[in-house]
From Swiss-Prot:
Residues that span the membrane, as ranges: 1-21
GO cellular component, one term: membrane
Record note on quaternary structure: Part of a stable entry-fusion complex (EFC) which is at least composed of proteins OPG143, OPG147, OPG155, OPG086, OPG094, OPG107, OPG104, and OPG099. Formation of the viral membrane is necessary for the assembly of the complex. Interacts directly with protein OPG107.
Membrane disposition: Single-pass type III membrane protein
Species, as recorded: Cowpox virus (strain Brighton Red) (CPV)
Keywords: Disulfide bond, Fusion of virus membrane with host membrane, Late protein, Membrane, Phosphoprotein, Signal-anchor, Transmembrane, Transmembrane helix, Viral envelope protein, Viral penetration into host cytoplasm, Virion, Virus entry into host cell
InterPro entries xref list: Poxvirus_A28 (IPR007664)
Function field: Envelope protein required for virus entry into host cell and for cell-cell fusion (syncytium formation).
Main localization, broad class: virion
Protein name (record): Envelope protein OPG155
Gene that this polypeptide is encoded by: OPG155
Amino acid sequence: MNSLSIFFIVVATAAVCLLFIQGYSIYENYGNIKEFNATHAAFEYSKSIGGTPALDRRVQDVNDTISDVKQKWRCVTYPGNGFVSASVFGFQAEVGPNNTRSIRKFNTMQQCIDFTFSDVINIDIYNPCVAPNINNAECQFLKSVL
């Protein structure tokens, strides 16, 4: 064995030892790690002190770049007609003939989630709270879920 191979053996042994030490440290503190994660889970998607939003980068969705809670899209139960996707901007819309817009309704919560948080950018929005219909039932419902 020459000195170069001995050097690489020492470096590899040190690296393996560090991995074992890290693994043992996680094993010893696993209860504390779970407690910390449970305590701070509510802040997972909140805005950080630095001003940049804390994002879940595993899945891209429409709420990733929004830090205001009212602007985030959510699926809510619509009275008597299934589920709708809503935010402060309005509802996800269906565009009908003559460019008329109506609320897009879904039969199940899963259909609403799949449509709202899909990779497709859904830009059709219907806001019932713009003049002259400020006091209609759809606007009151939108305000109640925000």
